[in-house]
Structures are given as C-alpha cells and as structure tokens.
A protein has these predicted regions:
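Short beta-strands and strand-coil junctions in structured, solvent-facing domains, enriched
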Residues: 35-38, 196-197, 251-254
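Structured loops at beta-to-helix junctions and adjacent beta-edge loops in soluble globular domains
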Residues: 18, 33, 89-91, 126, ...
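N- or domain-start disorder-to-order transition segments that initiate the globular core
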Residues: 1-25
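His/Glu-based metal-binding/catalytic segments typifying zinc-dependent metallopeptidases
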Residues: 29-31, 145, 215-259
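M16/MPP (pitrilysin/insulinase) zinc-metallopeptidase core fold and M16-derived inactive scaffolds
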Residues: 27-89, 155-158
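Charge-rich, well-structured scaffold segments of protease-associated domains
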Residues: 2, 8, 66-216
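Soluble periplasmic/extracytoplasmic beta-strand elements of cell-envelope proteins
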Residues: 14-16, 27-31, 87-89, 187-189, ...
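Short, solvent-exposed loop/turn segments at the edges of secondary structure
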Residues: 23-25, 63, 68-70, 80-83, ...
C-alpha cells in the first residue's frame, strides 16, 4: 500500500506527498481541475492550447525548460476532457528548481502575442497531423457528437474546429487562465526522496503567497439518456474499411465501473 500524506494551504492548494527513498529523484505533478469540458462551444481546444502556453514562459521566467534541464530534470504535460496535468522530475538536490518553476507559472504567465502565435501554429499543425492528414484520423471527431448531443464531451480535447484555435486572441487566453488556473483549483502531488516536512516547507515557500481566485461552480448540461441507436457512414480514401463502436457506461466513481 502506498502511503500518502496530505496538506492543505490557506489559499486552497491541496498537497499530496509520498516518500520513497529507493530513488534519488523527486516528481512534482500538478493537476488543474480544467479540461475541454470547461470550454465554450465556440472556443474549443483552449484547455489543450493552454498546455502548450504554460511552457512559453511565466511572469518571472522567460523559458521554462532551460532551467529545469540545467537542473537535470525533465517535464511533460497532457490534457483530457476533465483535467490538465503537468509534471516535472528532478534530482532530489535540485527539487527546489521544480517548485520555483511550477509556482511561477501558476502565479501568472508571460502573456505575449509572440508566444500565442507560436503555440497556435504548433497546435494547429498537431490538429492537422492527427485528425486531418492521416487515415482514420477524424474517427473520434465524428463519433463524439453522436455519443453526446448536449454535454461538452461532444468535442475532442484538441478542439472541434481548427478555426477556434486560429482565432484565439490574447484576451481570450487571459480570460481562460484567470478563470481556471489558481491554487484553489489544483492538486500538487510530490513523490520521491523528499520528506513530508521538506515538501510542506517548500510548498508553503513557493505556493503559499499565490492568491486564490474566484473559481465559478460548474453548470454543465446533463446529457439525456440515449434511447435509440445512432449510425453514421462516411467514405474516405483509406487502406481498409473500419467499424468503430461506442457505449455509454456508468460514472468512474460508481462501484460498477471496475466490474
């Protein structure tokens, strides 16, 4: 059984800690409670766009990757319908570098037209590569709006239309950041060769002064029960025919989920 200790900062940041002295590394993972389901139907793909923008420099640090790499660390991130996840792994003696970097970009990004333009281009190319320029790439883009008629799960994480990313403005992304990125909307997990006392001390030092923000309660539309079969047939220039099926299932928190 993995032993996990918990700590809550006054600004609402939840911290989880697991001590492991079998390694000389420490991993910091931050989950923000924001995903593609929190986007407006006319501005899809923003959660994923932000995953990229978070590496474009913060208020006090112009380049995220360089200081982490100099400290012997590595990092990555991913976005889902429900959350956005960031992690860094560093040698234990350089762990404070990761705290410094993660806290600064939680505080505020270095919003600039240049960074936005670069990341928009990167995300648009990813959209084309994954969904438009390879066989079967648009399968789940077609499947999702069949499975969901009103819930925001009906569009993929990368976005419903490439134009939503192309048309994103600096004010749009600033609004999204201040709406969702805050200590009281995040969970910081720390695992590796660092004591609980040191983890608390560094969390308080680097994250404690970041003010909480007004995080509005979600009001997602409830998906009506599907009572009919749904079918779509499309023709593409692909090597072989393909059939894709999907079923609705219970919630992840239900006892039946793992059965």
């Amino acid at each position: 059984m993995i032993e996990v200790s918990r700590y809550l900062l006054p600004n609402g940041l939840k911290m989880l800690h697991h001590f492991d002295n079998s390694t000389q590394m420490v991993a910091l993972n931050i989950i923000y409670d924001v995903g593609s389901k929190d986007e407006e139907p006319s501005q899809t793909g923003f959660a994923h766009l932000f995953e990229h923008l978070m590496f474009g420099g913060s208020v006090n640090i112009p380049d995220f990757d360089t200081p982490l790499q100099k400290a012997g660390g590595e990092n990555n991130a991913w976005t889902s319908n429900d959350i956005t996840n960031y992690y860094s792994v560093v040698p234990r003696q350089n762990v404070e570098t990761a705290f410094w970097l993660e806290s600064d970009r939680m505080l505020e990004l270095n919003f600039s037209e240049k960074s936005l333009s670069v990341q928009k281009q990167v995300v648009c190319e990813e959209f084309k590569q994954r969904n438009l320029n390879q066989p079967y790439g648009d399968t789940y883009m077609l499947l999702r709006p069949m499975a969901y008629k009103v819930h925001p799960y009906r569009w993929p994480t990368i976005g419903k239309e490439i134009s939503h990313i192309e048309n994103a403005t600096l004010e749009d992304v600033k609004t999204f950041f201040y709406k969702h990125y805050a200590p009281n909307n995040a969970i910081l997990s720390i695992a590796g060769n660092i004591s609980f006392e040191d983890a608390v001390r560094l969390t308080e030092k680097w994250f404690g002064s970041i003010p909480k923000r007004n995080i509005a309660a979600r009001n997602l539309p409830e998906e009506p029960e599907q009572k009919e079969s749904r079918f779509l047939e499309v023709y593409r220039s692909v090597p072989l025919d393909a059939i894709t099926k999907a079923w609705h299932m219970c919630r992840r928190t239900d006892k039946e989920y793992h059965s």
